[in-house]
């Protein structure tokens, strides 16, 4: 008799996605990140749900409701800090996941890659709106600065900003709508992640060698479920260490001051995971140019499948392109550092050089390296 997991309509879907899924036998730890992102999303939705039970999206009470969660709600501080540091874990896994996709040529599955880029944008939007909710100084001024960028759009800019704000400044209406979207978007992310998986399972996973793995596949369970559980344990270990020992390591002290529209913080900056994009935005003196560069810093990922000119899929056997990849990594770390620095010499010029290099490496140097390698291999 055939097992119910292979015949039952619902169990069959789960079976084909997580149990009997044919998986390359040689995929490394870097393929764990997808399941870790799923775990991060579940943690964020669960902790967020409990926080929403006690939070009030009102300018008069938002700050004190967060303080109430931290002080008076049973284990409220744990839930709050797990949610705040969970976002950092989420973005760490996201960046590593994208890096893996770039290095091993996973972007050649175009639908999966493009939906992944949309997922990144949606996650960034969700995290930005979540940062506004505690209604501290950095929440208010971060929201003001970033939403104000819409005013750079010709003709409709000013009207658009006031429409987003729900008034003439970031106020109660803005906070309420940001809370609404922050609550809804994670479920949209979950739906997009399901579509992401759907497209991935159409072609199957790639592997480190970049060659087809059809002749050599194994079932996902038990081999990769065990491997993923190990990754999950390490992730939870890191998250709980941050939450219990250093909960404020990655947050801004300014956000412990109640939002005051009459007092501007000395340095307005977003959370660490947005600093690279913020540095690109700041390094262009023109407002519209900065906004375009900011958007393109993410959307540039979508052109990578088109600029792939190598005859090999993966970078495993391509030393010149590997150098370019690690240059890009170092460049992103430089941009992250610059984003947190004040706008003064020498940080301005470093930021401008790093911003130019970011786009240059992705659009020109990596494709050029591929052509050189093709020539060297006489292909």
From Swiss-Prot:
Q: Which InterPro entries match?
A: Cyt_b/b6_C, Cyt_b/b6_C_sf, Cyt_b/b6_N, Cytb/b6-like_sf, Cytochrome_b, Cytochrome_b_C_euk/bac, Cytochrome_b_N_euk/bac, Di-haem_cyt_TM
The terms describing its cellular component in GO are: mitochondrial inner membrane; respiratory chain complex III
Q: What Pfam families would the database entry show?
A: Cytochrom_B_C, Cytochrome_B
Q: What's the protein's topology in the membrane?
A: Multi-pass membrane protein
- Residue positions binding a ubiquinone: 201
**Which residues are listed for heme b b566 binding in this entry?**
97, 196
Out of the domains of life, which is the source?
Eukaryota
Instruction: List cystine links.
Output: none
Where does it localize? Mitochondrion inner membrane
Q: Any idea what job this protein has?
A: Component of the ubiquinol-cytochrome c reductase complex (complex III or cytochrome b-c1 complex) that is part of the mitochondrial respiratory chain. The b-c1 complex mediates electron transfer from ubiquinol to cytochrome c. Contributes to the generation of a proton gradient across the mitochondrial membrane that is then used for ATP synthesis.
Q: Which family does it belong to?
A: Belongs to the cytochrome b family.
Miscellaneous comment = Heme 1 (or BL or b562) is low-potential and absorbs at about 562 nm, and heme 2 (or BH or b566) is high-potential and absorbs at about 566 nm.
Complexes and interactors: The cytochrome bc1 complex contains 11 subunits: 3 respiratory subunits (MT-CYB, CYC1 and UQCRFS1), 2 core proteins (UQCRC1 and UQCRC2) and 6 low-molecular weight proteins (UQCRH/QCR6, UQCRB/QCR7, UQCRQ/QCR8, UQCR10/QCR9, UQCR11/QCR10 and a cleavage product of UQCRFS1). This cytochrome bc1 complex then forms a dimer.
* UniProt-recorded name of the protein: Cytochrome b
Which organism is this entry from? Saimiri sciureus
Q: Which gene encodes it?
A: MT-CYB
């Amino acid at each position: 008799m055939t097992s119910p997991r292979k015949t039952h309509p619902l169990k069959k879907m789960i079976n084909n996605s997580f149990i009997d899924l044919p998986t390359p036998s040689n995929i490394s730890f870097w393929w764990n990140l997808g399941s870790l992102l799923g775990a991060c999303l579940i943690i964020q939705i669960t902790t967020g749900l409990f926080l929403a039970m006690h939070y009030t999206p009102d300018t008069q009470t938002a700050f004190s409701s967060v303080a109430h969660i931290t002080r008076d709600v049973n284990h409220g501080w744990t839930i709050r800090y797990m949610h705040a540091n969970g976002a950092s874990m989420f973005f760490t896994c996201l960046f590593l996941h994208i890096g893996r996709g770039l290095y091993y040529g996973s972007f050649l599955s175009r639908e999966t890659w493009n939906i992944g880029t949309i997922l990144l944008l949606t996650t960034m939007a969700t995290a930005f709106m979540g940062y506004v909710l505690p209604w501290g100084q950095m929440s208010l001024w971060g929201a003001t600065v970033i939403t104000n960028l819409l005013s750079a759009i010709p003709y409709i800019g000013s009207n658009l900003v006031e429409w987003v704000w729900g008034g003439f400044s970031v106020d109660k209406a803005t906070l309420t709508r940001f809370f609404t979207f922050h609550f809804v978007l994670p479920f949209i992310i979950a739906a997009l992640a399901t579509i992401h998986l759907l497209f991935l399972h159409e072609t199957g996973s790639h592997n480190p060698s970049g060659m087809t793995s059809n002749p050599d596949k194994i079932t996902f369970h038990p081999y990769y479920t065990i491997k993923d559980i190990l990754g999950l344990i390490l992730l939870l270990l890191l998250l709980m260490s941050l939450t219990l020992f250093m909960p404020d390591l990655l947050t801004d002290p300014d956000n412990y001051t109640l939002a005051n529209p009459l007092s501007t913080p000395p340095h307005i900056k977003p959370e660490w995971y947005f600093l690279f994009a913020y540095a690109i935005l700041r390094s262009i003196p023109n407002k519209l140019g900065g906004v375009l560069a900011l958007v393109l810093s993410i959307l540039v990922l979508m052109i990578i499948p088109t600029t792939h000119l190598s005859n090999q899929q993966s970078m495993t056997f391509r030393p010149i392109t590997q150098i370019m990849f690690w240059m890009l990594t170092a460049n992103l770390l430089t941009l992250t550092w610059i984003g947190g620095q004040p706008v003064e010499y020498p940080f301005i010029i470093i930021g401008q050089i790093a911003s130019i290099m970011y786009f240059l490496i992705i659009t020109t140097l990596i494709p050029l390296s591929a052509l050189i390698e093709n020539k060297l291999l006489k292909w």
